[in-house]
């Protein structure tokens, strides 16, 4: 008989727990004291560390003064963002265009690759999954240098397409691994049941497999969009004239001082990210309830 080591460990720990009433009270008192003295402190400090810089950006986006002294509330920087920032909007458009296009391609390729790895058995399957981790552990400088050398070798001009190709290659392993983790939880006997009921391979794919792994596909797509939008190092190496993205544009502005217009744009992007996140969460919740 095969024994689950984790289940055996849990059973052993349960047996080793003190059963007396004083021991239970002592354990609960210790957990309560440690929870509020250490865990809560760490949680609060972590949240402050994460969200305080964002709060500062939001506050200074409404500052009437260009400097660090807060002199009053004003919407002047949002007006400048809307009407006097053509280059900034162009760089944002380039970033969004590259992010969504590279995320779409990497999601399609990653989904097909994950399905192929899970469905078929062949030699070297384990090595492919291991190699997929390399872009996650390699420094982006190495990836950027190797990518620009490869593009130079094949005579590919640097521009928006080179950034798109580099971001697709960089995001593909992340999407592949996220979808693969979702597929590993899928029961393929459902597909066999669909075949027995007369479904074709296309119907089984579109009506059984894809709906089951849709949360993983959407998560991989959003991860790819986020990674593409925030990437600076790889984009710095493979960009060319007329292909400035938002991170490159912000970097060029920081060299001459941070403009409050960037703060206004940051708040708009934070607000958009929050709305997309909650909308996606509600969609996945309704999708799970519908199933």
Q: For the regions a protein language model found, what residue spans apply to each?
A:
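Cytoplasmic-entry segments and transmembrane alpha-helices of multi-pass inner-membrane transporters
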Residues: 36-43, 112-147, 191
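Transmembrane alpha-helices
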Residues: 49-54, 176-180, 186-188, 201-230
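Membrane-interfacial helix termini and adjacent extracytoplasmic/periplasmic loops
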Residues: 23-25, 29, 67-68, 75, ...
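Non-cytoplasmic
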Residues: 57-65, 175, 217-251
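Loop-to-helix entry region at the N-terminal start of transmembrane alpha-helices
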Residues: 87-94, 152-172, 216, 221, ...
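C-terminal transmembrane helix and the adjacent membrane-cytosol boundary/short C-terminal tail
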Residues: 1-28, 38-41, 124, 180-191, ...
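Interhelical loop and adjacent transmembrane-helix boundary motif
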Residues: 30-35, 78-87, 228-281, 291
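Transmembrane alpha-helix signature in integral membrane proteins
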Residues: 62, 86-119
């Amino acid at each position: 008989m095969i024994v689950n080591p984790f289940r055996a460990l849990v059973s052993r720990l349960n047996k080793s727990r003190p059963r007396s009433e004083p021991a239970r009270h002592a354990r609960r008192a210790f957990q309560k004291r440690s929870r509020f003295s250490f865990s809560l402190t760490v949680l609060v400090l972590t949240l402050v560390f994460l969200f305080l810089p964002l709060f500062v950006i939001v506050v200074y986006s409404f500052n009437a003064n260009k400097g660090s002294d807060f002199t009053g509330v004003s919407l002047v920087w949002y007006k400048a963002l809307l009407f006097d920032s053509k280059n900034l909007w162009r760089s944002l458009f380039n970033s969004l265009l590259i992010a969504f296009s590279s995320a779409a391609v990497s999601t399609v390729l990653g989904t097909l690759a994950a399905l192929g790895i899970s469905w078929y058995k062949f030699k070297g399957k384990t090595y492919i999954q291991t190699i997929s981790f390399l872009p996650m552990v390699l420094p982006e400088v190495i990836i950027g240098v190797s990518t620009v050398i490869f593009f130079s070798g094949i005579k590919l001009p640097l521009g928006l397409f080179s950034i798109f190709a580099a971001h697709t290659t960089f995001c593909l392993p992340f999407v592949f691994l996220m979808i693969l983790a979702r597929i590993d939880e899928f029961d393929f006997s459902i597909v066999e049941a669909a075949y027995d009921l007369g479904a074709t391979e296309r119907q089984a794919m579109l009506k059984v497999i894809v709906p089951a792994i849709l949360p993983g596909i959407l998560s991989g797509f959003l991860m790819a969009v986020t990674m593409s939008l925030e990437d600076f190092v790889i984009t710095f190496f493979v960009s060319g004239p007329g292909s400035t993205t938002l991170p490159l544009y912000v970097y060029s502005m920081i060299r001459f001082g941070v403009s409050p217009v960037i703060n206004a744009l940051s708040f708009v992007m934070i607000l958009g990210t929050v709305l997309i996140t909650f909308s996606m969460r509600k969609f996945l919740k309704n999708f799970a309830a519908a199933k």
